[in-house]
C-alpha cells in the first residue's frame, strides 16, 4: 500500500538514529533527539497559487531532505511503518553529496 | 437522504476500528484512538480561488483518504450514521493499493 | 416583514427539535442539543471576490442546510420568530432526499 | 452638522428601545438589551478592492439595517445625538416591509 | 518645521477640549475624555494597493475628521506642539457643516 | 564599513538626545526617553509587491524621519556605532524645514 | 556534503565570536551574545510570488549578512558544522567594505 499526497504535501521516511559513530563506537544516549532528516517517498502534484496555476514542488522522490525541529508531528502508518507528512514549506533544503 | 457538500468540503465515512489482528486475534483496548482514515462519500464542486475560477478537488468518491489527527471534529448524522465533514486541506493523501 | 441578507449571508430557520421518534415515542430530554440544520429563507447576492466579481452562493431558498456546531450564534427576530444569520462558509452542505 | 463616512463605513441611528407592546402595554425592564437595528443616515463611497476598483455599498440612506450584537461600539456625537459608525461587514441585512 | 506623512498616514491636530458650553458656562471635569476629532494638517500621497497603483486618500488638508476612541496613540512633537499620526483607516469620516 | 539594506529596510542613525534647551540651559534627566527621530543612512531597493513589481521607497538618504515609539528595537553595530534597522512601514513621515 | 536550500531560504555560517579587541586584548566574558552576522554559504532559487513568478534573492554566496537578534534559531549540522537556515526576510542587509 502507498499514499498519494495531495498538492504541496510530501511523504518522508525519517532517517534512523545513528547510535554509533562512523568508526563503530556505540554512543549510549546519543540519539535522544530524533534526526530531522529523511528520504522523500512521494510528492504531491504541486502548490496551487492564487491565480490558479500549479507550482511543481522543488523536491523529488529519493531526495534526502532536512526539515525543521518542530515539523514532523504529522505521521501516518503505512504497512506498519510510520511515515511523516510534511508540507514543502517545512523543508529547509535538500542534502547533496 | 444524502448531503451535497459545498465548495471544498468532503464527506467521509470514518474507517471502523480494527480490534482484531489480521490473524483474528482480539486486541483488547487496542482501538482507543480512532483511525484517521475513511472513505470519501461525496465531494464539493471545488475550491474558489481569488480570481474567481474553481479548482476541482483532488479526491474522488470512493477514495480512501488519510487525514490529520485533529481533523474530523465536524460531524453530521445522516440516516443515523455519523459522517465527517472535512476540508480538502485536512486531507494528507489518498491510499492506493 | 422580511430581511434581505447582504453579500454572502444567508437567513436560515433552524429545524425544530424532534422530541419523538418516527414511531411517535416521546424521548424525554433527547433534544438537549439544538439541531444544526435548517431551511434557507433568503440568500445574499453573492460573495465579492478580490477581483471585484461576485460569486453567486451555492445554496438556494428552500434548501435544507447543515451547519457547524459553533455556527448559528447570530440571530435576529423577525415578526417574533428567531432566525439565524449564517455566512455561506458556515454551511457544510445541502441535504437531498 | 453631518458626517461624511469614508469608504465602507456607514452612519446609523440606532432604533429606540420599545418598552411597550404593540397593544400599548408597558413592559418594565424589557428593554435591557439595546436593539441591533437602525436607520442608515449616510454611507461611504464604497469598499476599495485589491485591484483598485471601488465596490459601491449594498445599503442606502434610509434603509433599516440589522447588525451584529457586538457591533455598534463605535459612536460619534453629532449635534448632541449619538450615532453609530459601522462597517458594511457588520451589517447582516436590510429589513423590508 | 513640518512633517510630510508617508503613504496613507495623516497628521491631525486634535480638537481642544471644550470646557465651557456654547453659552459660556464652565463645566468642571467635563473634559475628562479627549475629543476624537481634529483638523487634518497634512496627508500622505496615498495607499499603495497590491497591484502597485496608488489610491489617493479621501481626506484633505483642513478637513475636520472623527476617529476611533482607541486611535490617536501615535504622537509627534512639532515645534513644541503634539500632533497625531493616524492611518486613513483610523478615520470614521469627515464632519461637514 | 557600511550596510546595504534589503528591499524595504532603511538604516537610520538615531538623533542624539538634546539635554540642553535652545538657550543652552541644561535639563537634568530630561532625556529619559530616546527621541524617535533620525537621519536616513541608506535605503533598500524597494518593497516587492504581490505582482512582482518593486515599489521604490518614499524616503531618501539624508532625510530626517520620525518613527513609532515601539520601532527602533532592531539595531546593528557598524564600526562601533549603533544604527537602527527600520521597515518603511515603521516610519511616520519626513521632517521638512 | 552540502545543502541546497529551497526557495527563499539561505544557508549561513555564523561569524565566530571575537573575544579579543583589534589590538589583541582579551575581553573575558565579552562574547556572551552570539554575533548576528554570517557568511552566505548557499541561497535558494527565489521567492515564489502570488502570480507564480520567482523573485531571485537579493543576497549571494559569500555575502556577509546581518540578521535579527531572534533569527538564527533554525540550525542544521553539515559534516559536523552547525549552519543557520534563514529566510531572506530575516536578513537586514549586506555588509560592504
UniProtKB/Swiss-Prot annotation, chains A, B, C, D, E, F, G:
GO molecular function (one): unfolded protein binding
Cell location: Cytoplasm
SUPFAM superfamilies noted in UniProt: GroES-like
InterPro entries: Chaperonin_GroES, Chaperonin_GroES_sf, Chaprnonin_Cpn10_CS, GroES-like_sf
Recorded GO CC terms: cytoplasm
Signal sequence, renumbered to the chain: none
GO biological process, one term: chaperone cofactor-dependent protein refolding
Keyword Glycosyltransferase recorded: no
Keywords: Chaperone, Cytoplasm
Pfam families with a match to the protein in the record: Cpn10
Highest rank taxon of the organism: Bacteria
Keyword match Chaperone: yes
Subunit relationships: Heptamer of 7 subunits arranged in a ring. Interacts with the chaperonin GroEL.
Family: Belongs to the GroES chaperonin family.
Function: Together with the chaperonin GroEL, plays an essential role in assisting protein folding. The GroEL-GroES system forms a nano-cage that allows encapsulation of the non-native substrate proteins and provides a physical environment optimized to promote and accelerate protein folding. GroES binds to the apical surface of the GroEL ring, thereby capping the opening of the GroEL channel.
Protein name: Co-chaperonin GroES
Species this chain originates from: Oleispira antarctica
UniProt gene name: groES
